[in-house]
C-alpha cells in the first residue's frame, strides 16, 4: 500500500481542457495531514504511518487520544488514518503531507461514505421494474415473488428487498487528477466522488492501473 491523504469534498464544478471540452470535476480539500505515528516491525510487528486530519478541540478527544497526539507534537485532530508501507524511513513524526503528494494526470482511488437515502423501496434501491400501471393492476411497486412456499418456508438471506439505502463506505477507482493547487491544498478530480459536500474522503494512488 502507498501513502494517501485525507480530505474534504467541497463540491463540483467544471473546467475546460485545451480543446475547449468541459470536464466535470470534484473539488477536494486535501490535507495538510501531519504524521502522528510511525509503526515499525520491531515495535508493532509491521511498518506503517498514521496521519491526522481536521482540527478539533481538546474537549472533543479522550485523554488517551490527547496523549497519543502529544507524542508527535500534533494539534488535536478529528480523524486518523493508517497506511501500510514497506519502508517508513523517509517519514518522521510531525511531518506534513499535503496535496503536492499527487500530480496532474495521476490515477487515484477515493473512498468515502455515500449519501444516505433513508428507507428506500425496490425500484429506487435495486432498480427493479415496476408492475403494470393499468386500472386493474394491484401491483405497481411491489417486489413480486420473494421465494418458494412451504419449502423452504423462509426467505433466503441476501434477498434484495426494501431497506436502508446509502450511508455505506464506497470506493471509486481510477479517477484522474485534473489539477493540483499545492498552495491551497486543493485537488480537482475528474468525475464524482462518494458523499455530499463536507464529507470525509480517503485519497490514495490507484492500486489497479490498466486499460480494462
Curated annotation (Swiss-Prot):
GO terms for biological process: translation. PROSITE patterns: RIBOSOMAL_L3 (PS00474). Keywords: Ribonucleoprotein, Ribosomal protein, RNA-binding, rRNA-binding. One of its GO terms (molecular function) is rRNA binding. GO terms for cellular component: cytosolic large ribosomal subunit. Coiled coil: none annotated. InterPro entries: Ribosomal_uL3 (IPR000597), Ribosomal_uL3_bac/org-type (IPR019927), Ribosomal_uL3_CS (IPR019926), Transl_B-barrel_sf (IPR009000). Residues 142-153 have a biased composition (Low complexity). SUPFAM superfamilies: Translation proteins (SSF50447). Belongs to the universal ribosomal protein uL3 family. This is Large ribosomal subunit protein uL3. The gene is rplC.
